[in-house]
Design a protein with these regions (language model features):
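Generic beta-strand or strand-like secondary-structure segments
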Residues: 68-72, 87, 107-114
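Surface-exposed, interaction-prone regions with an acidic/low-complexity signature
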Residues: 85, 91-93, 99
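Conserved catalytic core of Hanks-type protein kinase domains
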Residues: 39, 87, 118
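Glycine/proline-rich, positively charged
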Residues: 95-172
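Glycine/Thr-rich phosphate-binding loops of Rossmann-like dinucleotide-binding domains
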Residues: 26, 55-57, 94, 134-137
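Active-site beta-loop-alpha junctions enriched in small/polar residues
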Residues: 21-23, 52, 87-91, 129-132
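A short alpha-helix capping/helix-coil boundary motif
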Residues: 12-16, 91-95, 147
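N-terminal binding-site loop/beta-alpha segment at the start of enzyme catalytic domains
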Residues: 1-83, 122
Length: 172
């Protein structure tokens, strides 16, 4: 397996990343366990998940993929062998955090804490915003006109306080 340095960190990630978005919906928990075991056997140490998974997203399966990974970590004690990436879901799912899913402090903090609990870990190696939260033309919307004065969307720079706090505390 080939490995690359992750950004400006000292983490070495496999050039193949294990995607997990179907676990709990299209794939069973035992199948997820089998894939995780096989990934480590072949040196795949970079794994990607998200609070939104499994896919297709539904309120009933929200966070389920993270739960599967967390149970596997608890069972195998292999958390230290994995470079784990997860994502906070942005706008679009009203069942997330009671519809409070914009990228602002309390929502980011609640999402991060939920992921940590489901994943049964005290740190996440790479924490990402799943969707941009900006007022842009998306999914084929016709006739979109950008308004420079539009202030209802958060700027990405405004989102870093809870994330920086988590980085300082070695949670992310």
């Amino acid at each position: 397996m080939n490995y690359q340095k992750l950004g400006n960190t000292n983490l070495k990630v496999s050039t193949i990343c294990l995607g997990t978005m179907t676990w709990g919906e299209q794939n069973s928990e035992p199948e997820g366990y089998e894939q995780m075991d096989l990934a480590l056997d072949y040196g795949v140490n970079f794994w990607d998940t998200a609070e939104l998974y499994s896919v297709p997203p539904r309120a009933e399966t929200f966070g389920y993929t993270e739960l599967i990974i967390g149970r596997w970590f608890k069972k195998t004690k292999n958390r230290d062998k994995v470079i784990l990436a997860t994502k906070v879901a942005g706008p679009a799912r009203d069942y997330l955090r009671n519809g409070q899913n914009s990228f602002v402090g309390k929502n980011l903090e609640e999402a991060l804490n939920g992921s940590l609990k489901r994943l049964k870990t005290d740190y996440i190696d790479l924490y990402q915003l799943h969707w941009p939260e900006r007022n842009v033309n998306s999914f084929g919307k016709l006739g979109y006109k950008h308004d420079e004065e539009e202030n209802e969307w958060n700027k990405i720079e405004d989102n870093d306080n809870p994330i920086n706090a988590a980085i300082t505390q070695n949670v992310v």
